[in-house]
């Protein structure tokens, strides 16, 4: 889509008077979904334990889920023992579980995959490539992500468009749009520009020169562009810092030793300052790494799950405190799933995975999508217990985007493959 076309789409977006935020929690390295959402009925747990061998979580430690809509054929699922906070959210109806979602170009059967008779996502099982595809719905090297393209549609709805797409964890294509530029902050607030500090690079003269450059004009195009970018950055830093300073501290506790929790605390603080910043639609990106557990899975994965549970439950509690729980939806994402089979000490690169969707507007206490068969060489297995996704990232994203306020006619501008799938959105929301 051209910049002009995207601009026309943004201009055509119906005015919004409420506030909504989407928060992507990306789990870098590929979370082991097999030990995150676990079969609990006796038949499927026995199959799981047999396949996973030493990786299997003991049955007595699992946290069983009782959904409002039962799974077919008497199937039951449970959460890992470390996910107590998420279990509480599920039981309260504030969280749903998205089953077997992954990157797809078109609906794909096992026979089609084996015959290579339909287009497949590029370079399956590759971290960099699949991170890019998950975040952009395009091939690795994409310059815009679907979170950023959502932001493109709502730039003119925000008083300051700079705060439409925000990243609290560095740089990610997910929140880069064709017009929207991701604004990066730290867990403690706006990142101060060294060049505008009172003593930049050890010299007050340098600071004065940089400030003058940002405020002046020149016959040289590059100098003017630099000045424009610097001026925008200085203004955004001041506006965000002022907005954060003007809201009361959150009473909801966040674990300061949990980096994901601190990122989400910053998101909550930014949402609290939405009035001062004039924002009505925002897309946030946070992340946690360390999930590529080819070995030491039993030792290391539980600690990562604890961080996820702590962070997401604290963040949801903060949205309740701020009175915006129904206006904020958080979802997890990852490179891909992992093999159900064990390599002896861990699991290897997979494809489909299970994910969480959290928020007051979510039709919680439910499973969404199709439950895969727990079996190696089964109907959902492309090899070694790698799940063939039955719900595409585009379908999941389209459901989130529809809740966000995107018209059906605009969905293909954000999700290039969504028209390849059945019409209608996943029933993620009330």
Sequence positions of predicted segments:
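Catalytic phosphate/nucleotide-handling subdomain of diverse soluble enzymes
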Residues: 346-347, 356-358, 362
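Active-site lining segments that contact anionic ligands and/or coordinate catalytic metals
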Residues: 281-283, 325-327, 333, 350-353, ...
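Feature for exported/extracytoplasmic and membrane-associated proteins, marking the mature portion
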Residues: 1-321, 341, 357-358, 366-430
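Metal-dependent active-site segment of extracytoplasmic phospho-/sulfohydrolases and closely related
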Residues: 319-344
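Short glycine/threonine-rich loop-to-helix capping motif typified by GTGT followed
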Residues: 295-300, 336-352
């Amino acid at each position: 889509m051209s910049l002009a076309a995207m601009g026309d789409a943004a201009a055509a977006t119906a005015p919004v008077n409420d506030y909504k935020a989407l928060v992507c929690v990306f789990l870098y390295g590929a979370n082991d979904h097999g030990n995150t959402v676990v079969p609990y009925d006796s038949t499927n747990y026995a199959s799981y334990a047999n396949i996973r061998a030493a990786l299997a979580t003991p049955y007595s430690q699992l946290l069983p889920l009782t959904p409002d809509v039962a799974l077919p054929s008497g199937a039951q699922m449970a959460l890992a023992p470390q996910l107590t906070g998420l279990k509480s959210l599920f039981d309260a109806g504030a969280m749903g579980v998205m089953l077997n979602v992954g990157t797809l170009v078109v609906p794909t059967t096992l026979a089609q995959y084996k015959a290579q008779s339909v287009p497949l996502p590029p370079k399956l099982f590759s971290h960099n490539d699949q991170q890019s595809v998950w975040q952009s719905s395009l091939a690795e090297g994409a310059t815009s992500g679907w979170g950023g393209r959502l932001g493109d549609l709502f730039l003119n709805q925000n008083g300051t468009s700079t705060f439409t797409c925000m990243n609290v964890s560095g740089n990610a294509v997910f929140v880069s749009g064709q017009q929207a530029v991701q604004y990066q902050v730290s867990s403690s607030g706006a990142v101060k520009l060294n060049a505008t500090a009172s003593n930049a690079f050890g010299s007050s003269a340098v600071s004065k020169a940089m400030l003058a450059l940002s405020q002046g004009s020149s016959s040289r195009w590059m100098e003017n562009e630099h000045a424009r970018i610097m001026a925008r950055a200085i203004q955004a830093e001041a506006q965000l810092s002022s907005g954060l300073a003007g809201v009361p501290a959150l009473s909801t506790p966040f674990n300061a030793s949990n980096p994901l929790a601190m990122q989400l605390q910053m998101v909550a603080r930014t949402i609290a300052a939405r009035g001062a910043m004039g924002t009505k639609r925002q897309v946030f990106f946070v992340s946690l790494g360390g999930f590529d557990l080819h070995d030491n899975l039993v030792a290391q994965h539980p600690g990562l799950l604890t961080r996820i549970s702590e962070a997401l439950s604290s963040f949801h509690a903060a949205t309740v405190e701020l009175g915006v729980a129904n206006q904020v939806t958080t979802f997890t994402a990852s490179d891909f799933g992992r093999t159900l089979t064990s390599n002896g000490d861990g699991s290897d690169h997979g494809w489909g995975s299970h994910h969480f969707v959290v928020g007051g507007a979510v039709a919680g206490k439910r499973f969404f999508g199709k439950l895969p068969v727990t079996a190696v060489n089964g109907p959902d297995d492309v090899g070694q217990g790698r799940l063939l996704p039955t719900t595409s990232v585009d379908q999941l994203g389209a459901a989130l985007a529809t809740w966000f306020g995107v018209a059906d006619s605009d969905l293909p501008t954000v999700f290039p493959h969504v028209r390849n799938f059945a019409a209608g959105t996943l029933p993620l929301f009330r």
